[in-house]
A protein has these predicted regions:
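Conserved N-terminal diphosphate/IPP-binding helix and adjacent helical/loop segment
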Residues: 1-72, 78, 84-87, 91-99
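Secretory-pathway/luminal and periplasmic proteins that interact with or process carbohydrate-rich
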Residues: 74-77, 145-147
Length: 147
């Protein structure tokens, strides 16, 4: 995957995240802070690259799938950075979520991003029912005890 391809993927995902998260309260601000932080979006790039091989998946479905995987990844990073885990103070070139906001807000933010990842898949009119089930299963496996 080229850097320009990843940059295009990132732009699509960040536009979708911006739509999903209008800045209306403290938790959403914290969600935006981490979800829209500078990142390579490699996971999203893998979704787009594999999806582009399958012409039965629409571009909009790929955007929703890629967005959900990035939201799930961001949730995992926020929780990983917590004082009770790795206690990292920096993430993606900026203060970790629990440093910028506080530990309780970071926990709620991560939880909300995880829920939004699932909600985004389930709510997408572009993703077929079979694709929704397999996507939710893959996300659950990745963030659960199998991941």
């Amino acid at each position: 995957m080229s850097l320009s391809f990843l940059s295009e993927c990132k732009e699509k995902v960040f536009q979708r995240i911006d739509t999903l998260l209008p800045d209306t309260n403290k938790i959403i601000s914290a969600m935006r802070y981490s979800a829209l932080a500078d990142s390579k979006c490699i996971r999203a790039g893998l979704i787009f690259a594999s999806g582009n091989l399958n012409k039965e998946i629409s571009e909009l479905a790929l955007i929703d799938m890629a967005t959900s995987i990035e939201l799930m990844h961001t949730y995992s990073l926020i929780h990983d950075d917590l004082p009770s885990m790795d206690n990292d103070e920096m993430r993606r070139g900026q203060a970790s979520n629990h440093i910028k906001f506080n530990e309780a807000t970071a926990i709620l933010t991560g939880d909300a991003l995880q829920a939004l990842a699932y909600e985004n898949i389930v709510s997408s009119p572009e993703i077929t029912q079979i694709q929704k089930i397999s996507s939710i299963k893959a996300l659950a496996d990745a963030c659960g005890h199998k991941g």
